[in-house]
Amino acid sequence: MVFTNSLSSYYEKFLATGEVKCIDEEIPFEIPATWEWCRLGYIFSHCTGKALNGTNRKGNLYTYITTSNLYWDRFELSSLKEMYFTEEELGKCTATKGDLLVCEGGDIGRSAIWNYDYNIRIQNHIHKLRSYIPLCTRFFYYVMYLYKGIGYIGGKGIGIQGLSSGALHNILI
């Protein structure tokens, strides 16, 4: 829970522990007084897809997308690859209409909404965000676009950088 005090500082209360922490340094910009900040992970469930493993042949072959298919606000679907997925993996690794897909690596944060009338599987370098409640997913696409543009999101790590599930969960929106 994020709240302000009388001095307009922002604080977050962790419900599990009751701890209160000042988060002024994390607030990217001011918002209207009737709005509230929260963590992305509180309104979206999120997970990544399946890692490519050439020796794993369990399940059935399905087409899937990688970061090379995901662009800002669109998908390039002319050359899809196939990989084996088990029934259990399908539940975690399948995007459905309305899901916001976000690149973990490469152009970190690059996003698009899956608006097709059929499901698609995702590789492990793509985060799938599915809202817990009905909301305007396009708004959150624009938030990701803005945050990428102003440098609020970026990669972490030495070598190949990425946007971890934990970092994505903790993005303030």
Each model region followed by its residue ranges:
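Extended, domain-scale alpha-helical bundle/helix-rich regions
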Residues: 1-19
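Short alpha-helix capping/helix-loop boundary micro-motifs
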Residues: 65, 81-90
